[in-house]
């Protein structure tokens, strides 16, 4: 891993929250090499709130290309094509912000964890350990094998070895357990090492139960990702969660950071995709417009969330095909843009993991028989749908559920709409995750697209990671299997770039950054030949 300079973060009172997509942090009168992650001039209570904000910035700002690939957004005709992205011919220079941001952020959490451990501040240490696990999950899901065991060692090991993705996942499960235990055991007073946790914990305000629920939900996400990997015993792991006893994030329990965002220190998603601190429209707001397949799918289902994910342009709620040349595509003002449900205000909290996603994860675990008591998979699914509506400000989901009764992309008991079409169950859960996580947590949607094998959903191919665009069936189609006029076809739709070849399809991973090949040469070379179609360990398609 290339050794870089880290600028440590400070609380919002003196924190300059920037709009940069690599979540660099404000200056704290030091600019030290990350080989010194325990510098005496910073303290764990100072670093924690800035680190949590930085995690929110990662979730907010790093996923534009995947928003496009998953058919939510597309480039407007106002801009020239991004040929590398729109033909899927990504390079070692593509998307490096995810790698850099996650490792930078984890150096901060390492500072918190190590210094808090020395001080006996178990609450702070526990939070840092859970959040490090969150970021390593992101890294594995994007890159596969990554430095883990030898990472964050500073000058003791400037060229860390890579760990197997499965081994990292197994370690993360135990790391989260340790974090939960530390938090639950922590004694908080106004004078001891855990003081001010209610203020410095900008996600849950020092609420032990919510941190335990978040940790358990994060563990469930890991288990769902690796559902087909037998080495991880799902029954055992669910048993550990049940024994801990806090459960998962529930109704209204969104994991989101709020350090005090406001006009001059805005929410990172709003500041990147809507307007800057002066209130001026950002370039990203002009660039990213509605994808026509995605927006039409919401419309086909009569989904009120359409007007929350998108805001009408001068042409109404219309989109543009991904990869369409500028000479053909509509200019940005004509097309629908990023809507008020995800870009609420500059003062809104930034979501890390929503209650809607928590219920979708629980629904899949119930569907697979891992969770054996409590609400049914259908009830958990419908609760997740309502939580999505609530988060987006879309009101009640009751009318939407009634309108789409028996349709398998909405109704867990839905029936096939044509010969060979999908039925309810897992298809419904995954379809609803696609509907709900638009610009909320796009990585999870890309992960679902990659992880589910063809045999999982009735007789119809739901996910296809092959490079054959003619069989690129992915999510639900709202009835198009019957050939209904106006119904959206299967998707996400492949790019329509005229420069694409028949060998090009949506990548199943990012490539390691070029800096790894430059500075950690032997270890990255040990991973073999990596292409955009080299699979993450849980991708068994």
Place the predicted regions along the sequence by residue:
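Hydrophobic helical h-region of N-terminal Sec-dependent signal peptides
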Residues: 11-17
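Active-site/pore-lining binding-face segments in mid-to-C-terminal subdomains
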Residues: 381-478
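Bacterial N-terminal signal peptides that target proteins for export
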Residues: 2-10
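Membrane-proximal, proline-rich intrinsically disordered regions
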Residues: 23-72, 100, 115-118, 469-473, ...
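Beta-strand acidic-aromatic groove motif in beta-rich domains, primarily in extracellular
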Residues: 60-69, 144-146, 234-235, 442-444
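C-terminal motif of bacterial Sec signal peptides marking the signal peptidase cleavage site
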Residues: 18-22
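Surface-exposed intrinsically disordered loops and tails
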Residues: 189-197, 276-286, 397-420, 465-499
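Structured, solvent-exposed acidic/aromatic patches
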Residues: 41-45, 77-131, 135-396, 415-426, ...
């Amino acid at each position: 891993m290339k050794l870089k300079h880290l600028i440590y973060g400070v609380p919002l009172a003196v924190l300059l929250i920037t709009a940069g997509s690599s979540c660099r942090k404000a200056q704290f009168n030091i600019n030290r090499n990350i080989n010194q992650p325990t510098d005496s001039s910073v303290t764990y209570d100072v670093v924690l709130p800035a680190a949590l904000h930085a995690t929110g910035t990662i979730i907010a700002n790093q996923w534009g290309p995947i928003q496009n690939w998953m058919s939510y957004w597309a480039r407007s005709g106002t801009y020239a094509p991004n040929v590398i992205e729109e033909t899927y011919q990504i390079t070692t220079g593509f998307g490096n912000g995810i790698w850099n941001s996650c490792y930078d952020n984890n150096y901060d959490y390492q500072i918190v964890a190590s210094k808090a451990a020395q001080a006996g501040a178990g609450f702070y240490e526990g939070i840092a350990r859970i959040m490090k696990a969150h970021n390593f999950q992101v890294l594995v899901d994007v890159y596969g094998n990554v430095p883990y065991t030898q990472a964050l060692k500073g000058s003791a090991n400037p060229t860390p070895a890579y760990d197997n993705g499965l081994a990292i996942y197994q370690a993360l499960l135990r790391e989260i357990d340790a974090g939960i235990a530390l938090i639950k055991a922590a004694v908080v007073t106004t004078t001891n090492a855990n003081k001010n946790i209610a203020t410095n914990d900008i996600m849950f305000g020092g609420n032990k139960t919510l941190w335990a629920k978040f940790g358990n939900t994060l563990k469930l996400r890991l288990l769902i990702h690796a559902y087909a990997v037998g080495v991880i015993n799902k029954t055992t792991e669910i048993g550990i969660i049940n024994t801990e006893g806090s459960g998962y994030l529930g109704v209204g329990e969104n994991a989101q950071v709020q350090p005090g965002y406001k006009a001059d220190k805005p929410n990172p998603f709003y500041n990147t995709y809507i307007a800057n601190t002066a209130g001026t429209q950002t370039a990203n707001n002009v660039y990213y417009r509605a994808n026509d397949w995605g927006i039409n799918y919401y419309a086909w289902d009569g989904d009120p969330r359409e007007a929350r994910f998108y805001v009408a342009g001068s042409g109404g709620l219309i989109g543009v095909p991904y990869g369409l040349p500028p000479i053909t595509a509509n200019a940005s003002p004509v097309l629908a843009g990023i809507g008020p449900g995800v870009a609420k205000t500059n003062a809104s909290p930034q979501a890390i993991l929503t209650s809607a996603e928590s219920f979708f994860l629980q629904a899949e675990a119930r569907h697979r028989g891992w969770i054996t008591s409590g609400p049914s998979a259908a009830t958990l699914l419908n609760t997740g749908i309502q939580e999505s509506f609530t988060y987006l400000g879309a009101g009640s989901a009751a009318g939407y559920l009634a309108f789409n009764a028996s349709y398998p992309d909405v109704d867990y008991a839905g029936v096939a709409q044509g010969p060979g079409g999908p039925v309810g169950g897992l298809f419904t859960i995954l379809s609803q995750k696609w509907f709900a996580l638009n610009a909320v947590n796009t990585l999870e949607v890309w992960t679902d697209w990659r992880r589910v094998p063809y045999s999982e959903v009735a007789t119809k191919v739901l996910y296809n990671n092959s490079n054959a665009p003619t069989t690129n069936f992915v999510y639900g189609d709202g009835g198009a299997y019957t050939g209904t006029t106006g119904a959206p076809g299967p998707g996400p739709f492949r790019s329509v770039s005229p420069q694409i070849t028949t060998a090009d399809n949506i990548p199943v991973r990012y490539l390691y950054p070029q800096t790894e090949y430059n500075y950690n040469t032997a270890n990255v070379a040990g991973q073999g030949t990596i292409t955009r179609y080299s699979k993450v360990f849980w991708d068994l398609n």
